[in-house]
Amino acid sequence: MAREECKALLDALNKTTACYHHLVLTVGGSADTQDLREELQKTRQKARELAVATGARLTVALRDRSLATEERAEFERLWVAFSGCLDLLEADMQRALALGATFPLHAPRRPLVRTGVTGGSSAVAARALSARSLRHEAESDFDVADLPQLEREVLQVGEMIDDMEMKVNVPRWTVQARQAAGAELLSGASAGASSAGGISVEERAGPCDPSKALAATVFSAVLLVAVALALCVAKLS
């Protein structure tokens, strides 16, 4: 039960960390907006909550000396995957901090990625104003105010990693995977190929179509008659 719970938490953390990673890649680009910065804040907070919950359960499980060998090995594999998620989260938070400081939203700036679209857009922007954009205008310093909080959270994640390594000593190089890297992809591809091959074999092994057999017979007879006529003409000449 504890292992399944840890797997579920780790799966949620993995997805949230991946989502945060993709969001960070757009900071400083032409699609960078206050909506994005708010989404980044919510996503990293969710990731930190999941990290705390996952780390607590894995720590309790791995410090249990009554665990069976196979059960401990499985928890150690989960621990290594969890450590990788935390490392990625910390690196992405540091990247978001650096990009957020370099590309503030409400300041003259050049976007990190340019779309090539130019021209006056003030009239279109005026028509596109909404309640949310007006609220953003009132909270124009959101991204600047969030940077100190993000910096503190980066330090907290680093401290969490150090604290975990002090509580549970699981060297990553001692944990063996149950299957080779990318085995899921290879197994899926082979399953698809085998199913396709099975279909083609069944199609080839099916009964012969009578109409096709009749057409082949007629064609063979016509061909034989043509060859016989050609031989007769050759002898007469």
UniProtKB/Swiss-Prot annotation:
Kindly report the protein's main subcellular placement as a broad class. Answer: membrane
UniProt membrane topology term: Single-pass type IV membrane protein
Q: Which residues form a coiled coil?
A: 30-54
Q: Which GO terms describe its cellular component?
A: membrane; rod photoreceptor outer segment
- Describe the outcome of a gene knockout: Mice show light responses that recover at a abnormally slow rate.
> What InterPro entries does the annotation carry?
RGS7BP/RGS9BP (IPR026512)
* Tissues in which the protein is found: Predominantly expressed in photoreceptors of the retina. Weakly expressed in other areas of the central nervous system.
Extracellular-side segments: 234-237
The Gene Ontology biological process terms listed for this entry are: detection of light stimulus involved in visual perception; negative regulation of signal transduction
Membrane-spanning parts: 213-233
Region of interest (SNARE-like), residue spans: 153-202
- Please explain the role this protein plays, according to its UniProt record: Regulator of G protein-coupled receptor (GPCR) signaling in phototransduction. Participates in the recovery phase of visual transduction via its interaction with RGS9-1 isoform. Acts as a membrane-anchor that mediates the targeting of RGS9-1 to the photoreceptor outer segment, where phototransduction takes place. Enhances the ability of RGS9-1 to stimulate G protein GTPase activity, allowing the visual signal to be terminated on the physiologically time scale. It also controls the proteolytic stability of RGS9-1, probably by protecting it from degradation.
Quaternary structure (record): Specifically interacts with isoform RGS9-1 of RGS9. Interaction is decreased when RGS9-1 is phosphorylated at 'Ser-475'. Component of the RGS9-1-Gbeta5 complex composed of RGS9-1, Gbeta5 (GNB5) and RGS9BP.
What family name appears in the similarity comment?
Answer: Belongs to the RGS7BP/RGS9BP family.
Name this protein carries in UniProt = Regulator of G-protein signaling 9-binding protein
